[in-house]
Amino acid sequence: MIKYKRILIKLSGEGFANKEKNLAIDFELVAKIASQLKIIIEKGVQVSIVVGGGNFWRGVSAEKNGIPRNRADFIGMLATEMNALALQSGFEKAGLKARVQSSINIDQKVAENYINEKTLKYLNNGEVVIFAGGTGRPYFTTDTAATLFAAEIKAEVILMGKNKVDGVYDSDPKKNENAKHFSKITYDQILEKKLQVMDLTATSMARDNNINLIVFNLLEDNSIIKALEGKITHTEVTR
């Protein structure tokens, strides 16, 4: 049973890469995501996605090499456009209708400009909307972009698919085998404990707009469906 009707999925760009095969985009993973979205949409759930660009570009390391932060962030925005177009193609191959909407001005042959009314129309028609370009401004993360878009389209929940991490812990589980996993936690507790889930702007915005957050391991089989149905190890963050 899925209790949400409109969701936003936050996918990290880094999670798309297949380092073993030396691929920037793992299309096998894209196909697995697409097959899950088909099932979810058939159940009446409206799906939007915000994708990062970390598989192509890491802005923090760029700054260390003399590239100004604002320019590095714009390069990162272009990286999200590439990921969004790749997702769109993978989804369409699976029989889904998908749109890419960009928060930065880009040739309309490549992607549409983001217009809220159009987004809602597409979602109501059962199409997947992929948001690219982050917030369109430097100094903001794609986590903040995800929360911003979720608030604008009135999504009830953000699904944050992590790479081999199945939720929120009190410390890094990859470094501390005794890290404590939270099945449920509030945004205020995250802020108080200074847990690295989303940046402070995104966390506060999600809390203030009463948007739930589900953090789960994207790489598990049928993870998106199971996360929505509560049948996978995850963390639910609420106000």
Swiss-Prot record:
- Protein residues bound to UMP: G53, D73, T135, G136, R137, P138, Y139, F140, T141, T142
Species, as recorded? Mycoplasmopsis synoviae (strain 53)
Q: What is known about what this protein does?
A: Catalyzes the reversible phosphorylation of UMP to UDP.
Q: Does the keyword NAD apply?
A: no
The EC designation for this entry is 2.7.4.22
**Which NCBIfam families does its entry note?**
pyrH_bact
UniProtKB keywords: ATP-binding, Cytoplasm, Kinase, Nucleotide-binding, Pyrimidine biosynthesis, Transferase
Q: Which GO terms describe its cellular component?
A: cytoplasm
Q: In which pathway does it act?
A: Pyrimidine metabolism; CTP biosynthesis via de novo pathway; UDP from UMP (UMPK route): step 1/1
* Family under the similarity heading: Belongs to the UMP kinase family.
Compartments reported by the entry: Cytoplasm
Q: Where does ATP bind?
A: K10, L11, S12, G13, G54, R58, N163, Y169, D172
Assembly and interaction partners: Homohexamer.
Q: Which InterPro entries match?
A: AceGlu_kinase-like_sf, Asp/Glu/Uridylate_kinase, Uridylate_kinase, Uridylate_kinase_bac
| MF annotations from Gene Ontology | ATP binding; UMP kinase activity
Question: In what way is its activity controlled?
Answer: Inhibited by UTP.
Any one biological process term the GO annotation gives: UDP biosynthetic process
| This protein's name | Uridylate kinase
PANTHER family per the UniProt record, alphabetical: URIDYLATE KINASE, URIDYLATE KINASE PUMPKIN, CHLOROPLASTIC
Swiss-Prot/TrEMBL catalytic activity: UMP + ATP = UDP + ADP
